[in-house]
Amino acid sequence: MYDLTGKHVCYVADCGGIALETSKVLMTKNIAKLAILQSVENQPAIARLQSIKHSTQIFFWTFDVTMARQEMKKYFDEVMVQMDYIDVLINGATLCDERNIDATINTNLTGMMNTVATVLPYMDRKMGGSGGLIVNVTSVIGLDPSPVFCAYSASKFGVIGFTRSLADPLYYTQNGVAVMAVCCGPTKVFVDRELNAFLEYGQTFADRLRRAPCQSTAVCGQNIVTAIERSENGQIWIADKGGLELLTLHWYWHMADQFLSYMQSTDDENQEQFVSGQR
């Protein structure tokens, strides 16, 4: 179990919908500090959060997740002055706009990766940090394809690939930063907005989704925090239909283990065995 008591949490996402509900639950876990980085200031929401736990310090920065990494560094230098350190980084910024592929990819994937690359040095044990946990909030259509939201699905597949890659023991044993993901199923805040299919053939299905049964943001937020508390490095969870499921991960490439051993080996014989195994 991951104990959130006394932790310093940084949440990169709009303070509304799933992010707001997740933050509400975090505020009941006796965290010491909560930094919220979002594109638009939402003072009423922040006031609601502060009313839950007055002793928890809340900090806010207007933040564009698609900015260049050099600009991000300036923001997080300021964040660290207030936060001292970051125990938990939650990446929750998301966009589903099939008519704007660049914005969808930049928000959901590139921006998330740049955020992680910027924050990791502050957390890395070998660089003076204390280790910690990175939580990528993503979607179930990052696990299975969506014929309707193709660009969105592609970006979320990327989040899963990045999460699993960064969680490899190659990194975790060095930096002490665990990485996990929570894949949310259809949630009310998502289906309530106007949705466009990638191709016009899928628009009927996109329109129908607005009337489909889905989980509430409050239940989803609760399950995200529960997944964090149960987390281990490399885990992928599904938060859907009010429930929480830990995935059993599969390797589809049968040479994955051998290839990693080859990359880590300096022994010519071991390398020759790998080459022979590919034939």
From Swiss-Prot:
Gene Ontology MF term list: oxidoreductase activity
Enzyme active site: 152 (proton acceptor)
Superkingdom classification of source: Eukaryota
UniProt: NAD(+) binding residues: 11-34
Family matches, as InterPro entries: ADH-rel, NAD(P)-bd_dom_sf, Sc_DH/Rdtase_CS, SDR_fam
GO CC annotations on file: cytoplasm
Residues holding substrate: 139
Gene3D superfamilies per the UniProt record, alphabetical: NAD(P)-binding Rossmann-like Domain
Keyword Oxidoreductase: yes
Keyword entries, A-Z: Oxidoreductase
Cited PANTHER family: 15-HYDROXYPROSTAGLANDIN DEHYDROGENASE [NAD(+)], ALCOHOL DEHYDROGENASE-RELATED
Protein family: Belongs to the short-chain dehydrogenases/reductases (SDR) family.
Protein's name in the database: Alcohol dehydrogenase-related 31 kDa protein
Organism in which the protein naturally occurs: Drosophila subobscura
Gene: Adhr
